[in-house]
Every structure is written in C-alpha cells, then in structure tokens.
Swiss-Prot record:
InterPro entries: MTAP, Nucleoside_phosphorylase_d, Nucleoside_phosphorylase_sf, Purine_phosphorylase-2_CS
Organism: Rhodospirillum rubrum (strain ATCC 11170 / ATH 1.1.1 / DSM 467 / LMG 4362 / NCIMB 8255 / S1)
Protein's pathway: Amino-acid biosynthesis; L-methionine biosynthesis via salvage pathway; S-methyl-5-thio-alpha-D-ribose 1-phosphate from S-methyl-5'-thioadenosine (phosphorylase route): step 1/1
Domain of life, per lineage: Bacteria
Lineage, top ranks: Bacteria, Pseudomonadati, Pseudomonadota, Alphaproteobacteria, Rhodospirillales
Record-listed phosphate binding positions: 16, 58-59, 91-92, 190
Coiled coil spans: none
Name by which UniProt lists this protein: S-methyl-5'-thioadenosine phosphorylase
Length: 294
C-alpha cells in the first residue's frame, strides 16, 4: 500500500435512512468511475474535525437500488480509489434475538452469506486470489465504534452473527426460525458481499447493524405497524449520524497497518503465477490490489 494510504480516510456506506453526513467541511459530491461498473451514486467528500471523509449511499440518493441491484464491487472499488482506508457500514436489520430489541446497534463480527445473485469477488479467471474470511471485520475499528456507542449511551451489542439474505422479500417464518437455530443475531440484505469485497480491497471494515424490528419469528411481529418501524428507522438514522460525527477523534491516531491485519489481507492471497496473470485483469485491479500487484 502506498504512502497515500497511511493517513486515515473514513468511508461511510449509508443504508436505509442514512443518505448523507451532517457537518462536513468542504462538502462536495464527486463522481468516481470504476472499471467494475456503475457505482450506486456519487461520493460525498469533505472533512469532519480534520479527518477526510467519503460517504456513499448504498442504495443511491432517494433509495433507487434494491439490495440485489447494488453493484457492491463498483462501490468498494470506488471507495478505494477515493483513498478510503476504513469503512463504517451502516444498515438496517431485523432482530433474531429477544435481547436485541428495536433501537439496538449491533457491531456484527461474523456473517452467514445466503445471497446468490451477486458478484462476490474482484478476482477470477486470469488472476485468482483466496482471501481469509475467518475474521471478516476489523477488530480495531470495532473497538473504536464500541467506545463511541458507549459514550453516546446508544444501546448496543459488541459481536454477533449477521445473516445476509438475497431479498428483496423478507424471510418466511420457517427461514426465520432456522436462522435462529443457527445462532444468528440479526438479518439483513446488504453486508454480503460488501464485507468480502472490502477484505479483498484491504480496507478495514466494521458493520453497524441497526435493529428496526424483530424478524417474523417474534410473536409480536404481525402486530407492529409500518409507522412504528419507520419511526425506529428514523431514530436509528439520527443515532448513526451522531456515531459518525464522533468517529474522527477515534481515528486520528490510527496505527498503520492495523494490528488486526485488515490492511494486509492480500498478503500471500494471490496464487496465479506472475507470468500467467491476465494484464487486463491486473489493470482492472490497480486500485484494489495495487499494493501486491506492483
């Protein structure tokens, strides 16, 4: 990774209800092209308390993209091209646990990927890589997020398994009960393959899963109005903005590379012999894997 990446640049991917960042100095929407296709939207650039920030609305402004229609590869590639070194991924989820009521923020540290209609890797024919996903998120970044949530007195849980489904329909009762048997804590539609791609791009990634309601396993599920869910969604969005505003102070002394390995996840991952690597693929991966491809 070049010297340009030594200074932290915090990327924020906003999910349902979070479409911008308040208080950015020098705020401007910037188009970033990606060889992997269309990015969800322009990237909002600026500084917050001296920290460079880059915000991307996952579903586009106005929420025009369904989870299956988001080009996750283009989004992560564009954030890497924008200089992002850490990603705070904010998304709305349903709860699969009684002790995670609406309004709780879960710093998920594991995922089960049940998506099936999405491109899940930057690598492929002509340039093959296998990145470890045993620990898919940055423990260091998760620690900083946990500190902020505690400071703000936002109900939260550190650790948990995020079940990512394809959508756009919600789960059946049988599926919801199955995921609970698997030990999952929250269910959503967007953090896979997002977390996998951030790992491949050597960007430290932290999920903040904001519980809006209980999934359909819960006996009260059918009695909760849409208005109540929307109210929690908006309250969560306000809390998420408070979280983002407090993050710069936690990142100013960020070590490089991070001790959890997030900035070095491609070490020994590429297995295609240098003489056999596809030049076109290598050019396409110039941002994602430039550190190891040279």
């Amino acid at each position: 990774m070049s010297e340009a990446y030594r200074q932290p640049v915090l990327g924020v991917i906003g999910g349902s209800g979070v479409y911008d960042i308040d208080g950015l100095e020098g705020a401007r929407w910037q188009t970033v092209e990606s060889p992997f296709g269309d990015v969800s939207d322009q990237i909002l650039r600026g500084t917050l308390d001296g920290l460079e920030m880059a915000f991307l609305p996952r579903h586009g402004r106005g929420h025009v993209l369904a989870p299956s229609d988001v080009n996750y590869r283009a989004n992560i590639d564009a954030l890497k091209r924008a200089g992002v070194t850490e990603i705070l991924s904010v998304s709305a989820v349903g709860s699969l646990a009684e002790d995670l009521p609406p309004g709780t923020f879960v710093i998920a540290d594991q995922f089960i990927d049940r998506t099936f209609a999405r491109e899940k890797s930057f690598f492929g024919k002509g340039l093959v890589a296998h990145v470890s996903m045993a620990h898919p998120v940055s423990a260091w970044l998760g620690d900083r997020v946990e500190e902020v949530l505690a400071d703000l007195a936002i109900p939260h849980r550190r650790g948990g398994t995020y079940l990512c489904m394809e959508g756009p329909q919600f789960s059946t009762l049988a599926e919801s009960n199955l995921y609970r048997q698997w030990g999952c804590h929250v269910i959503g539609m967007t953090n896979m393959p997002e977390a996998k791609l951030a790992r491949e791009a050597e960007i430290a990634y932290c999920t903040v899963a904001m519980v809006t309601d209980f999934d359909c396993w819960h006996p009260d599920h059918d009695h909760v109005s849409v208005e109540a869910v929307v109210r929690v969604l908006l309250q969560n969005a306000d809390k998420a903005r408070s979280l983002v505003k407090a993050m710069p102070a936690k990142l100013k002394d960020r070590p490089y590379p991070l001790p959890d390995g997030s900035h070095r996840s491609l070490d020994n991952a590429i297995i295609t012999h240098p003489d056999r690597r596809n030049p076109g693929m290598a050019r396409k991966l110039s941002a994602v894997a430039g550190r190891v491809l040279g």
